[in-house]
Amino acid sequence: MSWMFKRDPVWKYLQTVQYGVHGNFSRLSYPTFFPRFEFQDIIPPDDFLTSDEELDSVLFGTLRGHVVGLRYYTGVVNNNEMVALQREPNNPYDKNAIKVNNVNGNQVGYLKKELAAALAYIMDNKLAQIEGVVPYGANNAFTMPLQMTFWGKEENRKAVLDQLKKHGFKLGPAPKTLGFSLESGWGSGRAGPSYSMPVHAAIQMTTEQLKTEFDKLFEDLKEDDKTQEMEPAEAVETPLLPHQKQALAWMVSRENSRELPPFWELRNDLYYNTITNFSEKDQPENVHGGILADDMGLGKTLTAIAVILTNFHDGKPLPVERMKKNQVKKECNSSESDKPGRKDTIKKTDGLSKEGSRYSEEPSISDVKKNKYSMSELSSSQPKRKKIAVQYIESSDSEEIEISELPQKMKGKLKNVQSETKRVKVGPSKIKEDTAFACALTSSASTTTKKILKKGASAQRVQRKLMFEERPRTTLIICPLSVLSNWIDQFGQHIKSDVHLNFYVYYGPDRIRDPALLSKQDIVLTTYNILTHDYGTKGDSPLHSIRWLRVILDEGHAIRNPNAQQTKAVLDLEAERRWVLTGTPIQNSLKDLWSLLSFLKLKPFVDREWWHRTIQRPVTMGDEGGLRRLQSLIKNITLRRTKTSKIKGKPVLELPERPVFIQHITLSDEERKIYQSVKSEGKATIGRYFNEGTVLAHYADVLGLLLRLRQICCHTHLLTNTVSSSGPSGNDTPEELRKKLIKKMKLILSSGSDEECAICLDSLTVPVITHCAHVFCKPCICQCIQNEQPHAKCPLCRNDIHGDNLLECPPEELACDSEKKSNMEWTSSSKINALMHALIDLRTKNPNIKSLVVSQFTTFLSLIETPLKASGFVFTRLDGSMAQKKRVESIQCFQNTEAGSPTIMLLSLKAGGVGLNLCAASRVFLMDPAWNPAAEDQRFDRCHRLGQKQEVIITKFIVKDSVEENMLKIQNTKRELAAGAFGTKKNANEMKQAKINEIRTLIDL
């Protein structure tokens, strides 16, 4: 198969050199090779504007019809019940056939042949989304009336009306509200009068607005609601904070609840859904789980661990094996005797002395003792960790990786299993450093164990049936690769030293694929990428062959794209209980929530159409009823506390103060001269665009000017790669056009900013540029072109675009630019001078204080390295170009409190990533402002979070009389917008005008 383009960074999805681990045993093996990318494999991005469900930004009108053939089908409907229309092009009797299904997916009947002939063309060509409601469904034996509404793009309205007119149909007026007042009359049918339709413009909200709206859903949470506390199981060593005890109590009650899910009632022996008017005899399955959406840094991981150990079956804790005290002491002494650099072998051991053992003396594949497994010493609140030294031996054809020291704590013991340290040949790979990181998480695996496991693999199909019949035991945790090590750390840190867990890290080409053995574990930990890879390969995926006791999605917003294979792999898992852990359940828009609800198996929202019709569309169009439904739903299945939330009058998290200071910088005469020259030239050009009314069509040029001004504020050397703002002209030769477009794209890519793709509204991934000089993510624009064939148009300027004309920036050109910059003679700048003065002054007062130096420009961070070295500072760095292993090493090095450890971390704005904890720092120097104030706040939260004991002081360097001061004005405006409410946001035209006003403010026009 071919690998698919995805919106996360490409390196993250090329992690196919992986490892299999159970508890303490790592496995290094040959890497797999990457098949080539193919156009047809491109996954649509985050449910963007060209997907089926987003074709409904405008309501065209209504149409009356009839459903026939009722007596031939088992599906039934109630009065005023919503129904779905489904094309059936392969129907042997009518190629235009359109089925009518109820909410449960059961066929009720089909549309009359004449009506189907008119609608089939509209549905097949995605000109409109057609939705139905049956006003009088009960007691109809042969036929029933149907009220249909047509939603689509404004540009498709004429085609829809013409198609209906061709078959003798006309649309009637739209309902007065987003709901239906069916008693007030019908839509138009054949030969009826024509009406003008009101246009409901879709409302687009910013990320800040959405986060604020989500927080507002919980403002009226009562003290007696979700505030009961519960103590965790005895096996949990770390004391829980009050808000974590509340979360534990709520999660346990959700898992054990027998209540009906939201919007369901029992009426006359039938279970009735109040938002779709659907009813059925069988009780809908309750949601045994939910969304833990606490703010970042409030300890969601510890809470999840507590749930796993506290709530097994029938409200009882997970039965775990306990070691005797003399055994614990013996193992701890053994750990302390390890010497750095010694090559260890894992020796054969006798059976462990246990209390209350659950198992017979048969070989165990994953007996994990917490004190042998943890990478942290529990002797202090800031545990010291032994590093796993990984030796690289380079050769022309391969790379040998050898574990030179395996910490005793990571080894554990296998009964009756021999294991030894090995050298393993690994073939060439572009991601060998990430492989080494993966290998470093745990230790080497036993060859004997592999034989035991593979022996049982042949019985997979038989075992699959048995596992669905038995009560499940195992919790499956799925997380991004970047936090895999964090989960291992957390289990080691928070579980008592005498507790044994059957724990398996499912990762790597040698990972155990026998569902029978996996299902005997207490915990299986894997990544989204591994789950997706297995799901897409031939044959059964082992993880999909097991009915899990519980599935936990860490950073669960990773499944927000409903079209991605990753999301499909997650939704297809079988489990009794389901949890989503995320501090940002809404990333870009309200539609991000659907995948989470579908994962929770919340009926009827497992089918996306009902979510869209009853909640998503009404809310985004400002309907109060839709907002009330959303509030009711969210409060039922979600628990969210922010850092400012209070419990019994006290803040959830009592953190030290976090003052923010703005330090104004005055440019030198030379810097100011360059700044004014660039500003005057660009201002004249953009002023011409305003006069011509084409400013948005030249948005790339505007960004280019703003970028150059921001770069000058930091350092004039950053201007090396910038180009003039002249765009492609009609007289350019193909090669000249290509060069100009590549330069424009390099201009945007070199900014290091959070420039968004206009389609998916996220940071650019695999960026390409069109002939009209607009930059998009390649998967986004390719899917857009594919969906709008043969007349695809640019989403920004509506000019014609073609897939053959998309240009990518060749990597060698970017590398060449970096080389040119590195050869320049270093000079300082006003901002660097101010930073160095502050750092030296800070070192004089307290040499132990650690600082983050944050910038959007990675090249600027490189320039800052020179004076840091000259002044004798010990520093480390974290940016998006670093392999995951290097990132982890950098973080661990910075968090180290020993003498000689780095006191400064150079951090790129976009490199924060999920699960990043930088509490060692108590000073933050923001070298340049971000467009998005939320992006700044997220970086500040990396050190201002649970575990921070010192006051965090933030300094923002802002150049006086510059674009940076104007950016602060824009930030304040965005924060004010974020204070609004659902239904009061700007529509598309107002958003465009706001963008134009922003440009005027930034350029001082």
Swiss-Prot record:
Pathway: Protein modification; protein ubiquitination. GO terms for biological process: chromatin organization; DNA repair; protein ubiquitination. Keywords: Activator, ATP-binding, Chromatin regulator, Cytoplasm, DNA-binding, Helicase, Hydrolase, Isopeptide bond, Metal-binding, Methylation, Multifunctional enzyme, Nucleotide-binding, Nucleus, Phosphoprotein, Transcription, Transferase, Ubl conjugation, Ubl conjugation pathway, Zinc, Zinc-finger. Residues 325-361 have a biased composition (Basic and acidic residues). Residues 834-999 form the Helicase C-terminal domain. One of its GO terms (molecular function) is helicase activity. It is found in: Cytoplasm; Nucleus, Nucleolus; Nucleus, Nucleoplasm. It comes from the Eukaryota. It catalyses: S-ubiquitinyl-[E2 ubiquitin-conjugating enzyme]-L-cysteine + [acceptor protein]-L-lysine = [E2 ubiquitin-conjugating enzyme]-L-cysteine + N(6)-ubiquitinyl-[acceptor protein]-L-lysine. Residues 767-772, 791-796 are annotated as: Required for interaction with the RFBP isoform of ATP11B. A zinc finger (RING-type) spans 757-798. This is Helicase-like transcription factor.
